[in-house]
């Protein structure tokens, strides 16, 4: 088939009034999809033009490599906020545009006429996407924050109990919250476009980076707490094996399920390590024999360990970093890395692949103001004025039917976004293999209806329907083939061989519905040497470099144990929205390949870029980071809720002005008055000295006292929250981020929503609880023409059911 003339977003004009990674990545994804992105910059340019995470010198006539990556395929125009004529120019651009992406750090963001609400008030045709730390409204809207302090507030620094109980908690390195917020912003922008088709109406999208972090760095801790009556974990614990030292380097091996732990023990020749009657978690059991596991791993090469683990179906990976990633055999075979079209360094390719729809090939990033005269000379008619439409109950994806053949976190998080905004999502399971998150209830299987009591499953699957079909049974496969033509989209995250073996690859699906969109979410892609490798979040983190930047410098890196899954989900969502737009324009179906590892390589892009461009290998640095000095966690007075002296605050000084504010807030002590501390470079050289004094100042004060003093002065600070306490934050209460959902088994339970608030609603995201297993069998099978007697026969044969096979 001849490729389409243009990518899905061709003709879609986006004005970029943002700065930083989140806005830059949002508009990069839109540009990759074909949008015309015009970046409006002040005379000194976007700060990222002079940024290098390693501190590499950027020549005056050049740009930082990260900027060159994020700005691929964009246009740059200059506008000075102090010149009225330039503001008129920006207004003309906005008049002609379809969307604008805004963040508070941009050069023109402070001008009242260019505030998000004001832009939307005067130009209601526009989709206005605002990206801020806490949201546009609420008690914390103007509070100072950085990626690091937001991770403290989100609970992401604690995560699932990451790290050693004998060390401070440790944040996830690499600015991951900004990258994920950018991906959510791109998806929200395309969602508003989807909703506005035919009406001409715009949308004000209010995105909170804090809320994006909650969804991607923590595992529905509030919902789990409400259903299980306890936190997921009360102490930090190292993943064992996790990232281990082999005879010739680092290797990652993980056990995310009881079966994998059993297989790992068999692989090592120690089946006695499995204690089936034990009440301890897998992590706790593994930690009991950590020294023995360490010795076993250390006596073998990386290749030997990986070959054994793969044979035993135990998840495993090489440990990626900026130096080695482009040369791994799998990524070489798939062409996962390309050359930057302007500066020649190595960068990741697109985070997903579409066929026959296409993404825009990377074009050179613009020089500062390169396209100013072009856009000043253009005469684009402004959009015709529209009446602000009355509020409608119709949600963006009303009328869209999704067959959700995914499990665990990555796939369901993608389809959950759709179900919360109106799509009919049919979650397909079987009684022999229910969704794996149903097993994460934190309860013994002797408990009544244990499979309905998982807060994790509930957190990912509200508003969905449940259908059970045993695909090992011929009748189950027949019914699946009957269901597919009724669905617009099929989403699956099996290893590739599973659907291929039953004739339901994309070509097979097309024979059933020619315009179907098939979204495939394999861990490592549809081809390449690792095609069939088991993929869980932590393995994706290891293989992509996300793990490499997390942990203490004197220890092996620590797996974030979180972001690999939801990051894959939000990138798959972006790809699906592009596919829907392609189908709207052409009538064609689309195969979408959204490999989890490709999404991870993109949010970890800075490592490969820095190494390729500057020869700098970024590494884990504990709780320090390249964007602030000082930046660290400091112990505070008091006991935590578990009776331990384990209370911490996160402090990050990102500017010289914030350093002056910090000095004033702590009484301008003599030690802080040294001229060598007045610059970021000087403070970076003296971080240990500063840390010692800040720790002494924080130690006699409670975390709340430290936060009150420093925030009032404008210093980024955060209390390190236990994740299950997220709902106590005043800002989240103000924004209604958590909603109570009545569940037939679990009762009234708090659920997180989406990290966006939309001017056209909905006022409430959760309209029905997560489905019971097979709850909608009768409804959906009747819709396929089956009679009650036929449905009863299917239940008798075990093709369908409402309880796991092992519980019957």
Spans of model-derived segments:
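Aromatic-enriched alpha-helical interface/lid elements that frame and gate functional surfaces
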Residues: 239-312, 316, 630-713, 717
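Conserved Rossmann-fold dehydrogenase catalytic segment
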Residues: 136, 166-175, 197-213, 230-236, ...
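Terminal low-complexity tails and localization/encapsulation signals of metabolic enzymes
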Residues: 1-13, 245, 321-404, 619, ...
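Glycine-rich beta-alpha junction loops
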Residues: 44, 133-135, 209-214, 248-250, ...
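Short, well-structured beta-strand/strand-turn elements
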Residues: 36-37, 310-325, 425-428, 711-725, ...
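Oxidoreductase and adenylate-handling cofactor-binding alpha/beta cores
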Residues: 154, 182-203, 219-225, 265-272, ...
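Flexible glycine/proline-enriched surface loops and loop-helix/loop-strand junctions
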Residues: 111, 167-177, 245-249, 357-360, ...
């Amino acid at each position: 088939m001849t490729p389409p003339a243009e990518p899905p977003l061709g003709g879609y004009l986006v004005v970029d009034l943002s700065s930083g990674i989140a806005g830059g990545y949002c508009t990069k994804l839109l540009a990759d999809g074909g949008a015309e992105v015009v970046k409006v910059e002040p005379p000194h340019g976007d700060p990222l033009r002079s940024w290098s995470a390693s501190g590499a010198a950027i020549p005056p006539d050049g740009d930082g490599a990260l900027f060159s990556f994020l700005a691929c395929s964009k246009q740059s125009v200059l506008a000075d906020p102090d010149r009225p004529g330039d503001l008129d120019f920006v207004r003309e651009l906005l008049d002609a545009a379809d969307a604008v992406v805004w963040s508070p750090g941009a050069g023109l963001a402070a001008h009242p006429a260019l505030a998000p609400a004001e832009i939307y008030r005067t130009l209601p045709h526009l989709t206005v996407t605002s990206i801020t730390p806490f949201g546009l409204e609420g008690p914390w809207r103007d509070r100072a924050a950085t990626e690091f302090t937001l991770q403290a507030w989100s609970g992401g620094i604690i995560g699932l109990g990451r790290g050693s109980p004998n060390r401070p908690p440790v944040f996830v390195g690499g600015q991951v919250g900004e990258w994920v917020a950018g991906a959510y912003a791109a998806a929200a922008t395309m969602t508003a476009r989807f909703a506005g088709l035919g009406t001409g109406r715009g949308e004000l999208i209010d995105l909170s980076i804090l809320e994006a972090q909650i969804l991607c760095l923590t595992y529905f801790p509030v919902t789990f707490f409400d259903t299980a009556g306890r936190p997921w974990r009360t102490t930090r614990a190292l993943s064992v094996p996790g990232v281990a030292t082999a005879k010739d380097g680092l290797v990652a091996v993980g056990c995310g399920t009881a079966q994998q732990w059993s297989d790992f023990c068999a692989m090592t020749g120690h089946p006695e390590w499995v204690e089936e009657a034990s009440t301890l978690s897998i992590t706790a059991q593994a930690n009991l024999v950590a020294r023995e596991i360490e010795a076993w791993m250390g006596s073998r090469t990386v290749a030997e360990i990986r070959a054994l683990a793969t044979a035993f179906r135990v998840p495993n990976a090489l440990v990626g970093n900026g130096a080695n990633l482009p040369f791994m055999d799998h990524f070489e075979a798939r062409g996962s890395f390309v050359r930057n079209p302007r500066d020649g360094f190595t960068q990741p390719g697109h985070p997903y692949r579409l066929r026959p729809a296409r993404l825009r090939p990377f074009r050179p990033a613009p020089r500062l103001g390169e396209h100013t005269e072009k856009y000043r000379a253009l005469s684009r008619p402004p959009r015709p004025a529209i009446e602000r439409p009355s509020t409608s109950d119709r949600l963006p994806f009303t009328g869209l039917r999704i067959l959700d053949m995914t499990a665990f976190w990555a796939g369901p998080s993608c389809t959950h976004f759709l179900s919360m905004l109106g799509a009919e999502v049919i979650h397909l399971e079987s009684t022999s293999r229910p969704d794996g998150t149903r097993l994460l209830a934190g309860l013994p299987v002797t408990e009544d209806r244990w499979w309905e009591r998982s807060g994790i499953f509930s957190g990912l699957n509200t508003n969905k329907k449940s259908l059970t079909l045993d695909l090992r049974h011929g009748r189950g496969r027949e019914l699946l083939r009957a269901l597919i033509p009724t669905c617009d989209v099929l989403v699956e995250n099996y290893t590739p061989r599973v659907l291929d073996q039953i004739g339901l690859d994309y070509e097979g699906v097309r024979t059933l519905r020619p315009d179907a969109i098939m979204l495939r979410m394999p861990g490592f892609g549809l081809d390449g040497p690792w095609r069939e490798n088991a993929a869980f979040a932590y393995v994706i983190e290891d293989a992509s470099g996300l793990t490499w930047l997390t942990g203490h410098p004197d220890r092996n890196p620590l797996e974030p144990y979180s972001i690999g899954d939801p990051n894959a989900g939000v990138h798959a969502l972006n790809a699906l929205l592009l596919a829907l737009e392609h189908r709207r324009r052409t009538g064609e179906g689309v195969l979408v390949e959204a490999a989890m590892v490709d999404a991870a390589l993109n949010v970890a892009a800075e490592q490969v870029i820095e190494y390729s461009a500057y020869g700098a290998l970024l590494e884990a640095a504990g709780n320090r980071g390249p964007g602030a000095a000082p930046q660290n966690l400091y112990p505070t007075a008091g006991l935590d809720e578990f009776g331990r002296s384990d209370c911490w605050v996160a402090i990050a000084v990102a500017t010289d002005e914030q350093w002056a504010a910090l000095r004033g807030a702590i009484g301008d002590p003599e030690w802080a008055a040294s001229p060598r501390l007045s610059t970021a470079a000087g403070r970076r050289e003296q971080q240990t000295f500063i840390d010692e004094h800040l720790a002494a100042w924080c130690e006699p004060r409670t975390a709340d006292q430290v936060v009150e003093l420093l925030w009032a002065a404008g210093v980024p600070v955060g209390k390190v929250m236990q994740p299950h306490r997220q709902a106590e934050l005043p800002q989240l209460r103000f924004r209604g981020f958590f909603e109570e959902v009545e569940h037939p088994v679990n009762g009234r339970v708090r659920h997180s929503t989406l990290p966006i608030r939309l001017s056209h609603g909905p006022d409430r995201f959760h309209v029905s609880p997560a489905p019971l297993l097979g709850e909608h069998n009768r409804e959906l099978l009747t819709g396929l023409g089956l009679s009650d007697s036929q449905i009863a026969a299917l239940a008798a044969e075990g093709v369908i059911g409402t309880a796991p096979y092992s519980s019957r």
